[in-house]
Amino acid sequence: AHVPYAELLKGDETFKTYSDIGCKYIVIPWINEEYLAGGEKNAEFYENVKKFGELANKYGMKLCYHNHDFEFKKVDGEYKIDLLYKAISPDLLSTQLDTCWVNVGGENPADFIRKYAGRIEIVHLKDFAGTKGGNMYALIGNDDSKKEAAAGSFEFRPLGSGLQDFPSILEASKEVGAHWVVVEQDEPSMGKSRMECAEMSINYLKSIF
């Protein structure tokens, strides 16, 4: 489950609820940059993540972090995402790696999966076309006018219709023992409906197995 930071701060109440409904993973889906390395709320965030990890363990779940591309900005020569995983031990924080944003951030997704072998629980399979720039995050929001503008230069695609090398991503995921791979496409594209995009991704995966 993707659970907003504000909900995680409620502590036992939130974690017990998700445990009671059978969740295995509780995921930090997004955090403002002020909470990451170099930000004024970074120390506070790291301490809270440790508490969240302990609570997840208490209730029989694992805490994961879902990345975007801004975690691939550097502070003192290191990526913010690497500094996060350095600060929080693997028993308290696992990885839900979004391969689209890894690529947009400038790294090879398969290589980055292998970098965190033993910590990767979930891999998001997400394809895209276009280049980094503009308001890419409008595509994961609710403002239709912004979505249309952003889609002009960058769009999410059904698997196999964009720039990603999924055979290498899937091979790396298998090598490191990822428990789940999840197809994700935030918005439909290519003139297709949501269900048509899902069908295209399913058929693509069938074609490479």
Regions found by a protein language model. Give the residues of each.
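C-terminal helical cap(s) of enzyme catalytic domains, especially alpha/beta-barrels
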Residues: 192-209
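A short, acidic, amphipathic alpha-helical segment used as a generic capping/interface helix at domain edges
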Residues: 161-174
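H/E-rich (His + Asp/Glu) clusters that bind or coordinate divalent metals
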Residues: 167-169, 180-183
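Short beta->alpha connector loops
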Residues: 3-9, 31-32, 100-108, 163-164, ...
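Active-site acidic/histidine proton-transfer and metal-coordination neighborhood
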Residues: 1-95, 115, 195
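Acidic/histidine-rich catalytic cores of soluble enzymes
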Residues: 57-163
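A short, acidic, flexible beta-alpha connecting loop/helix-capping segment that sits on the rim
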Residues: 182-193
